[in-house]
Amino acid sequence: MFNKQTNAIVLLFTFALFATLAVATPTIVARTGGSGSSCPTTDIKCCSHVGTFSEVQGYIDDDTKVKLIPALLGLLGATIDVVLGVVLGVTCSSISVGSSCSATTVCCENVVFNGLINVGCTAIDIL
């Protein structure tokens, strides 16, 4: 159906697309320490699962959405140092002050995939 020239163009386009994605993909750098004293209201999240990677691992086997997390982190080239205890928030949604959260309210430093994975989270109380 396709001739050799069309196949070559499709192959070249596919290669260029993946090369562009590899270069343009952000790298997550999980911070440790920090002041942790303030959280902009735009960064407040309500996460279904919060914990270190090993703590969240139990949910990865049970929750269909969460099964993709190791693969997504691998694609991003992210390295999460389990020894440092970097806290992840999984399947999070943005909330505003005064809103309720039936799960865990957190403030996270890095948000990936529109809240599917959040890195460097700290639990907070919304009054």
UniProtKB/Swiss-Prot annotation:
A GO cellular component annotation in the UniProt record: fungal-type cell wall
Keyword terms, alphabetized: Cell wall, Disulfide bond, Secreted, Signal
GO terms assigned for molecular function: structural constituent of cell wall
KW Ligase (keyword) present: no
Subcellular location: Secreted; Secreted, Cell wall
SMART domains hit by this protein: HYDRO
Disulfide feature: C39-C107, C46-C101, C47-C92, C108-C121
Signal peptide residues on this chain, from the entry's feature table: 1-24
Keyword Metal-binding (UniProt): no
Source superkingdom: Eukaryota
Family per similarity comment: Belongs to the fungal hydrophobin family.
Function of the molecule: Aerial growth, conidiation, and dispersal of filamentous fungi in the environment rely upon a capability of their secreting small amphipathic proteins called hydrophobins (HPBs) with low sequence identity. Class I can self-assemble into an outermost layer of rodlet bundles on aerial cell surfaces, conferring cellular hydrophobicity that supports fungal growth, development and dispersal; whereas Class II form highly ordered films at water-air interfaces through intermolecular interactions but contribute nothing to the rodlet structure.
Subunit structure: Self-assembles to form functional amyloid fibrils called rodlets. Self-assembly into fibrillar rodlets occurs spontaneously at hydrophobic:hydrophilic interfaces and the rodlets further associate laterally to form amphipathic monolayers.
Protein name (database record): Unclassified hydrophobin 5
Organism: Pleurotus ostreatus (strain PC15)
Gene: Hydph5
